[in-house]
Design a protein with these regions (language model features):
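Position-specific recognition of the canonical hydrophobic site in helix A of tetratricopeptide repeat
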Residues: 195, 232, 259, 266-268, ...
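Catalytic-center loop of serine/cysteine hydrolases
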Residues: 32, 58-59, 63, 70, ...
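Alpha-helical segment of the N-proximal tetratricopeptide repeat
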Residues: 182-216, 263-266, 299
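Structural signature of tandem alpha-helical TPR/SEL1-like repeats
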Residues: 201-208, 233-246, 267-282, 303-316, ...
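Terminal, low-structured helical/coil segments at or just beyond the last alpha-helical repeat
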Residues: 406, 413-449
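Helix-start (N-cap) detector for alpha-helical repeat units in TPR-like alpha-solenoids
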Residues: 184, 221-222, 255-256, 291-292, ...
């Protein structure tokens, strides 16, 4: 087990009480709803206009992020339940149920008489049934596409019966149109679609498209931030930091790059925990209901040894986003590593897996808890599930070999050999590979004797 011991070295502290949740009245009064935003169907459009479907999804996502009533389900989770060529209603119903959405925002874009027609639809999921309704279509010349689709977030919010103040409506409308350049927005939408495909090729394509987007509009704040996210996924942390800082300089009221800087500080080789806390706090100041920033703040406080503060931050995150698997993973870690609370930890990890069956982090954490408790068969099952999702997950392969040493030495040899074959090609695994070879030699010697 490679990670649990490291967590324990943070030190055990007794939690005397959970932090009181001090929430902004406007946010506390709103019940969050899990929504899935999907690209609109553009199968009838020519190739040059296919990007418009992703463009609508991005405009909706940016706009609805400004209100606590909408908890957006990460689109990356859609890949685990299936991604069709076009998002027709049957596919939307299946996927929305698979990711536990309460509502799905989708639709179709067609072209008629030289004009673009956007037909938005809304699916509200209820136990046993789903009800889909069509919203008022938008018809426009292509040149007005960016301005008109920016109307959709408010249209959906009102259809979902979300009460909006004038200030909230203005924020949503402004965020829904992140650039005045249609060409920059097209490149941005294409870049986001490439990033969502994942993999090295998809991310490199996304970086190229997003770089062109901010060349077209140097003041495209969301473009700078998104390019930073892609660089971070490509392990280019310095390039990522440069883009995040550029975004904060262009618009100091945009919270996402501050949260992203917090993530970079937290993962830095040096212990930049204070800087991480400061960055997360800034993001929360700008958007008090920013659940992921509360999770990051909890992680930073846990790293500093402030266990009570960490749990308080996680609890706040759950208020704003009760369906975020990452929060439950963080609670699972801290409950066991810092408090020794086995049942609470297992419950938290299982809740994360219930919300996202492909959550590698949750299954790794649960496997490590089982392993530490001597529940080796259960641990093996979790590590194998991780490898099913990611066949090159060296941490799961290493842990699996260790556990098999307890129950089946011959199988442990097989697992060590598989781990060494893969990990020996990775510079970051060098020290672990050396340890693995020692285990392998010892096992072979014991079995031979």
């Amino acid at each position: 087990m490679r990670d649990l011991g490291m967590l324990r070295r943070l030190g055990v502290m007794v939690l005397t009480s959970l932090l009181t949740l001090v929430l902004p009245l406007s946010a506390a009064a709103v019940k969050p709803r899990a929504v899935l935003i999907l690209p609109f169907d553009t199968t009838t459009l020519d190739q040059d206009h296919q990007w418009m479907g992703e463009g609508v999804a991005q405009s909706l996502s940016l706009g609805l992020a400004q209100h606590p009533a909408f908890v957006q389900i990460d689109r990356s989770r859609v890949r685990s339940v299936g991604q069709p060529e076009a998002w027709g209603e049957p596919a939307v119903v299946q996927v929305a149920r698979g990711v536990r959405a309460e509502a799905a925002l989708f639709g179709q874009i067609t072209s008629t008489g030289g004009e673009v027609v956007v037909r938005p639809r809304l699916l509200e999921l209820r136990p046993g049934a789903g009800e889909s309704i069509g919203l008022e279509p938008l018809t426009m010349p292509e040149g007005e596409f960016l301005a008109r689709v920016a109307e959709l977030p408010l249209l959906y919010a009102r259809t979902l019966r979300v009460a909006l103040t004038e200030a909230e409506a203005a924020r949503i409308e402004k965020a829904s149109r992140p650039t005045r350049s249609l060409r920059a927005f097209e490149l941005f939408a294409r870049g986001q679609a490439a990033a969502l495909r994942g993999g090295q090729e998809g991310l490199e394509s996304a970086a190229d498209l997003l770089s062109r987007a901010i060349e077209t509009d140097p003041n495209f704040v969301v473009g700078h931030y998104t390019l930073g996210v892609v660089h971070q996924s490509l392990s280019n942390r310095w390039k990522a930091a440069a883009q995040f800082r550029a975004a904060t300089q262009l618009d100091g009221s945009y919270p996402e790059p501050f949260k992203a800087l917090g993530d970079l500080f937290l993962a830095a080789p040096r212990r930049l925990f204070d800087q991480a806390v400061e960055a997360y706090m800034k993001a929360i100041e700008l958007r008090p209901f920013y659940a992921d920033a509360h999770v990051g703040l909890g992680d930073a406080k846990a790293a500093k040894g402030d266990i009570d503060g960490a749990i308080g931050a996680y609890q706040k995150a759950l208020v704003f986003n009760p369906v975020n698997p990452r929060v439950h993973v963080s609670l699972g870690k801290i409950y066991y590593a810092e408090k020794g609370l086995y049942y609470e930890s297992v419950t938290a990890y299982k809740r994360a897996i219930d919300l996202d069956t492909q959550s590698i982090e949750a299954r790794m954490g649960l496997g490590e808890v089982y392993e530490d408790k001597g529940l080796y068969r259960e641990a093996i099952n979790e590590y194998r599930r991780v490898i099913e999702v990611d066949s090159k997950h060296t941490g799961a392969m290493y842990n699996l070999a260790l556990v098999y040493e307890k129950v089946d030495p011959r199988e442990a040899i097989v697992q060590w050999e598989r781990y060494i074959a893969l990990a020996s090609q990775l510079a970051a695994e060098k020290d672990w590979v050396d340890v693995a070879r020692q285990h392998l030699r010892k096992l072979k010697s014991q079995i031979k004797d």
